[in-house]
């Protein structure tokens, strides 16, 4: 079993050119499926039937796994058996007839304007780390970019004079404006702080860790969780929370959906439309609480 999974992982990496995140997600799902098989249905992967996979889906549901997790796991298993069909291990895909679970649509966590101000005020601008963290958080809320885009930014992607950044995702570039407070925070960081942090003068990364190397996704996540704790905000704040809040606050203040779609880098406007539902839900909640006859 381990050999077949290793071959499939090699196929994803070399033939499909899967990203590290995609690779990790697929293999995590498949290793969990393999553990289930080992415990409840000891058999080689090519002998697995549709009934076995359906049983696994029911088992995950019984364990309280979310609909999104179950649906993703089915997709991972289906992809594995598509590969087995190509390699001649199986003649039919046993996962093909397994029904996906309907995903519940959860609205993203949104910070209020006051919560954003409180959160952005947490970094203490008294040392290099404080100035760097303040610049990162201001930039994230100013632009709504993804954390992967934030840590991929290079110094040349920022135009302080024109107040914008260039963000890139999946080979596409977009220009996103910056508000004055973000420009001010970035300017101080880039001119006064970043040069002190660099381990290598040739480093191109805009944001670096305290060792002078490009900031990692995990490193930034820890920074966000730290400031959530110091701010005393009960909502679960992730790097994506500021992206969601950016979109909703723009929408609440009159921005059109197409412009928000462009700034967020959504290929399909349906991905952006969820924010209209968030705004409507917020208005309904306000109405229910404030109207004397509600």
Model region roles, listed by residue range:
Residues 1-294:
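Conserved catalytic core of the tyrosine transesterase superfamily
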């Amino acid at each position: 079993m381990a050999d077949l999974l290793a071959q499939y992982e090699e196929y994803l990496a070399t033939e499909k050119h899967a990203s590290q995140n995609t690779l990790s997600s697929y293999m995590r799902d498949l290793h969990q499926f393999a553990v289930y098989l080992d415990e409840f249905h000891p058999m080689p992967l090519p002998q697995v039937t549709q009934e076995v996979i359906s049983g696994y889906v029911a088992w995950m549901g019984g364990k309280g796994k979310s609909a999104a997790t179950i649906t993703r796991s089915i997709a991972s298993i289906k992809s594995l058996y598509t590969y087995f069909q190509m390699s001649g291990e199986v003649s039919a895909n046993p996962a093909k007839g397994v029904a996906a679970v309907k995903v519940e649509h959860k609205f993203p966590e949104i910070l209020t304007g006051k919560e954003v101000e409180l959160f952005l005020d947490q970094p203490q601008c008294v040392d290099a780390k404080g100035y760097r963290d303040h610049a990162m958080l201001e930039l994230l809320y100013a632009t709504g970019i993804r954390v992967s885009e934030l840590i991929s930014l290079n110094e040349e992607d920022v135009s302080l004079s024109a107040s914008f950044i260039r963000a890139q995702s999946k080979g596409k570039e977009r220009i996103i404006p910056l508000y004055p407070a973000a420009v001010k925070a970035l300017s101080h960081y880039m001119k006064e702080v970043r040069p002190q942090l660099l381990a290598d003068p040739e480093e191109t990364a805009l944001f670096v860790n305290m060792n002078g190397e490009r900031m990692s996704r995990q490193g930034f996540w820890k920074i966000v969780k730290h400031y959530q704790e110091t701010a005393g905000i009960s909502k679960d704040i992730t790097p994506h929370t500021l992206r969601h809040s950016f979109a909703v606050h723009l929408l609440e203040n009159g921005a059109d959906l197409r412009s928000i779609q462009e700034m967020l880098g959504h290929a399909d406007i349906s991905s952006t439309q969820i924010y209209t539902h968030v705004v409507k839900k917020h208005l309904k909640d306000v109405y229910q609480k404030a109207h004397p006859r509600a």
